[in-house]
């Protein structure tokens, strides 16, 4: 019974803390009207777009190198 009380007290304590943290974040978002969130999304989308571009370029170059190597081996010019 003692361990059950202990675990319930721990769950209540953690729930109270998480609820207060959520309330603080909500109040902070209300004060600045979500401007920080928009900046984070803008930066993330910029990084995501750059990563896609780099991946696409690297894959294209790797494909060219692979095709050139295959053509070289097929024609025995290596």
Curated annotation (Swiss-Prot):
<keyword id="KW-0878">Amphibian defense peptide</keyword>
<keyword id="KW-1015">Disulfide bond</keyword>
<dbReference type="Pfam" id="PF03032">
    <property type="entry name" value="FSAP_sig_propep"/>
</dbReference>
<feature type="disulfide bond">
    <location>
        <begin position="72"/>
        <end position="78"/>
    </location>
</feature>
<comment type="function">
    <text>Has antimicrobial activity against Gram-negative bacterium E.coli ATCC 8739 (MIC=12.5 ug), against Gram positive bacteria S.aureus ATCC 6538 (MIC=3.1 ug), methicillin-resistant S.aureus ATCC 43300 (MIC=25 ug), B.subtilis ATCC 6633 (MIC=6.3 ug) and against fungus C.albicans ATCC 90028 (MIC=100 ug).</text>
</comment>
<keyword id="KW-0295">Fungicide</keyword>
<keyword id="KW-0165">Cleavage on pair of basic residues</keyword>
<dbReference type="InterPro" id="IPR012521">
    <property type="entry name" value="Antimicrobial_frog_2"/>
</dbReference>
<protein>
    <recommendedName>
        <fullName>Esculentin-2ISa</fullName>
    </recommendedName>
</protein>
<dbReference type="GO" id="GO:0050830">
    <property type="term" value="P:defense response to Gram-positive bacterium"/>
</dbReference>
<dbReference type="InterPro" id="IPR004275">
    <property type="entry name" value="Frog_antimicrobial_propeptide"/>
</dbReference>
<keyword id="KW-0732">Signal</keyword>
<feature type="propeptide" description="Removed in mature form">
    <location>
        <begin position="23"/>
        <end position="39"/>
    </location>
</feature>
<dbReference type="GO" id="GO:0005576">
    <property type="term" value="C:extracellular region"/>
</dbReference>
<feature type="signal peptide">
    <location>
        <begin position="1"/>
        <end position="22"/>
    </location>
</feature>
<dbReference type="GO" id="GO:0031640">
    <property type="term" value="P:killing of cells of another organism"/>
</dbReference>
<dbReference type="GO" id="GO:0050832">
    <property type="term" value="P:defense response to fungus"/>
</dbReference>
<keyword id="KW-0044">Antibiotic</keyword>
<comment type="similarity">
    <text>Belongs to the frog skin active peptide (FSAP) family. Esculentin subfamily.</text>
</comment>
<dbReference type="Pfam" id="PF08023">
    <property type="entry name" value="Antimicrobial_2"/>
</dbReference>
<dbReference type="GO" id="GO:0050829">
    <property type="term" value="P:defense response to Gram-negative bacterium"/>
</dbReference>
<keyword id="KW-0964">Secreted</keyword>
<keyword id="KW-0929">Antimicrobial</keyword>
């Amino acid at each position: 019974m003692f361990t059950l009380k202990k675990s319930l007290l721990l769950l209540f304590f953690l729930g109270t803390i998480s609820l207060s943290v959520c309330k603080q974040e909500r109040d902070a978002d209300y004060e600045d009207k979500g401007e920080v969130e928009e900046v984070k999304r803008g930066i993330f989308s910029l990084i995501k777009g750059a990563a896609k571009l780099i991946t696409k370029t690297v894959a294209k170059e790797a494909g060219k190198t692979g095709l050139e190597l295959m053509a070289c081996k097929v024609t025995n010019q290596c």
